[in-house]
């Protein structure tokens, strides 16, 4: 209630308000609001002062200042005990109701973070926690909700404790989303490899991938030398930072994607990202690339200097298939829109002239218009690809090498104007073909050497091998058996892998199988069914 004081003015009486303008106080929210209200009331033309009015005014201002001071001090006092955040009370109640588990991520003397025997990547874990307002660099107790439960994250300089209820869904969340997805798999003392998966809301996720052994084919060795020379020349000459763009073209199963595992073992790159674009046909190429770049920036180690020294390899798999699927997806949506009608029934039984049935339709595209739209989508993609190759899309804070895997590279340029002819020459191209006899023998020798040089532990022998099994049985007894492979033998790398698995990686049996492949009941020619 506003305090009003009657004031005698001649023969009439009038009331005026002594209280400050609370609206102004709420608007400013500072001591200046109180001072402003005091001055406004003091110099108001309607005010006529008397001793009662001054005393009431001083009393009201004193009460306001006292209440404000008490509230500020009490909030600061309660904040010290975290009583203003009820998560601590909720979590205490939750601990009484459920059994809880604790996972500890420990900082090691070598600078790594480990959960039991699993190395954890801080470059991945940091953005995961930051999305939940948890700061690893600021030790404290944090809480975040998962479904109906609270998880407590207790951070110190040496460890991160994750405390959560022993409920199956929550345990799976911690194991999969915190531990598994943020584990660090380092190869070549430096490289971490990820595979892109599309999560909820079409958001790409970087999932760590265990790096497998890969045989160094002639193309792999040649490209490795080119990449090393590219980075060396860039250091010496200080060229403008643009992506080194490469095209792997060839039939499926010829080893294009496997290059990621091969080069990861060399320790040239800091990160390798494999992205099969076919799983993301709702967005154009630029959107997909920007999302991946954002994920890379979010997961960058904040302690590393942003001097452009980080080397990143991105492998876009099946990009020509993605382009066709993307175009067909857009055309399909246009066809659906052409079939849409909207009806609105109104009016009374008597038939109101102002209401009735309204039908809104879309005119179907003619085949010529549909083809024109397909060409427009294709040319837009090629323009975006041109910008990537010219260095206008990605930031310059990293060294990028981008490999575009295709089955039919030229099909992406079908019907394109001459201005895109120069784009074809901007890629360093490698043609992948099926393995011939010499490559088959080289690969079988590589597998043979892997078995010979592997040091079996007692645990391996007890768990994986039987008493009658001998690793030497998998190896080649006499290299002359390779002469039995037909000279005109041609087989894809993927199909050769299938033959190896079907024969339990016994090299002698594999060679025997290859020598009789035409009369085999399991495989026909070099195209082996899945």
Curated annotation (Swiss-Prot):
Q: Which domain of life, per UniProt?
A: Viruses
Citing just one GO molecular function, the answer is: ATP hydrolysis activity
Q: Which Pfam families does the record associate with it?
A: AAA
> SUPFAM superfamilies given for it?
P-loop containing nucleoside triphosphate hydrolases (SSF52540)
Report what the protein is called: Uncharacterized protein L712
Starting at the broadest rank, the lineage of the source organism is: Viruses, Varidnaviria, Bamfordvirae, Nucleocytoviricota, Megaviricetes
């Amino acid at each position: 209630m506003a305090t009003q004081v009657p004031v005698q003015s001649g023969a009439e009486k009038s009331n005026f308000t002594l209280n400050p303008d609370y609206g102004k106080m709420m608007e400013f929210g500072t001591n200046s609001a109180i001072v402003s209200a005091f001055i406004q009331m003091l110099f108001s033309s309607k005010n006529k002062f008397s001793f009662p009015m001054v005393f009431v005014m001083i009393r009201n201002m004193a009460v306001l200042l006292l209440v404000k001071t008490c509230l500020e001090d009490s909030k600061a006092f309660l904040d010290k005990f975290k009583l203003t955040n009820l998560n601590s009370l909720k979590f205490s109640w939750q601990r009484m109701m459920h059994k809880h588990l604790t996972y500890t991520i420990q900082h090691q003397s070598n600078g790594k973070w480990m959960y039991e025997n699993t190395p954890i990547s801080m470059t991945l874990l940091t953005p995961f926690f930051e999305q939940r307002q948890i700061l690893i660099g600021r030790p404290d107790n944090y809480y975040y909700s998962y479904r109906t439960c609270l998880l407590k994250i207790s951070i110190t300089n040496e460890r991160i404790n994750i405390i959560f209820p022993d409920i199956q869904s929550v345990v799976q969340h911690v194991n999969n989303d915190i531990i598994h997805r943020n584990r660090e798999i380092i190869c070549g003392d430096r490289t971490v490899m990820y595979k892109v998966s599309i999560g909820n809301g079409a958001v790409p996720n970087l999932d760590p991938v265990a790096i497998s052994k890969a045989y160094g084919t002639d193309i792999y060795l040649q490209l490795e030398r080119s990449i090393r020379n590219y980075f060396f020349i860039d250091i010496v000459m200080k060229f403008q930072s643009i992506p080194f763009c490469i095209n792997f073209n060839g039939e499926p199963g010829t080893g294009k994607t496997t290059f990621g595992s091969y080069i990861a073992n060399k320790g040239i790159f800091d990160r390798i990202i494999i992205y099969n674009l076919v799983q993301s046909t709702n967005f154009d190429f630029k959107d997909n690339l920007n999302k991946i770049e954002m994920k890379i920036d979010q997961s960058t180690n904040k302690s590393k200097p942003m001097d452009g020294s980080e080397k990143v390899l991105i492998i876009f798999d099946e990009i020509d298939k993605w382009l066709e699927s993307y175009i067909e997806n857009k055309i399909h949506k246009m066809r659906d829109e052409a079939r849409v009608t909207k009806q609105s029934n109104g009016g009374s039984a008597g038939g109101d002239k102002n209401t009735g049935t309204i039908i809104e339709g879309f005119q179907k595209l003619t085949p010529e218009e549909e083809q024109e739209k397909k060409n427009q989508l294709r040319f837009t993609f090629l323009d975006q690809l041109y910008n990537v190759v010219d260095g206008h899309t990605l930031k310059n804070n990293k060294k990028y090498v981008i490999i575009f895997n295709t089955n039919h590279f030229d099909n992406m340029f079908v019907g394109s104007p001459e201005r895109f002819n120069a784009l074809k020459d901007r890629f360093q191209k490698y043609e992948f073909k099926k393995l011939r006899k010499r490559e088959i023998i080289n690969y079988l020798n590589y597998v043979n050497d892997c078995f010979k040089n592997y040091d079996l532990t007692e645990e391996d022998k007890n768990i994986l091998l039987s008493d009658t099994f001998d690793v030497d049985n998998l190896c080649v007894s006499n290299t002359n058996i390779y002469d039995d492979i037909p000279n005109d033998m041609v087989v894809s790398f993927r199909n050769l892998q299938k033959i190896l698995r079907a024969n339990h990686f016994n090299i002698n049996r594999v060679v025997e199988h290859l020598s009789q492949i035409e009369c085999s009941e399991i495989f026909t020619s070099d195209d082996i069914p899945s």
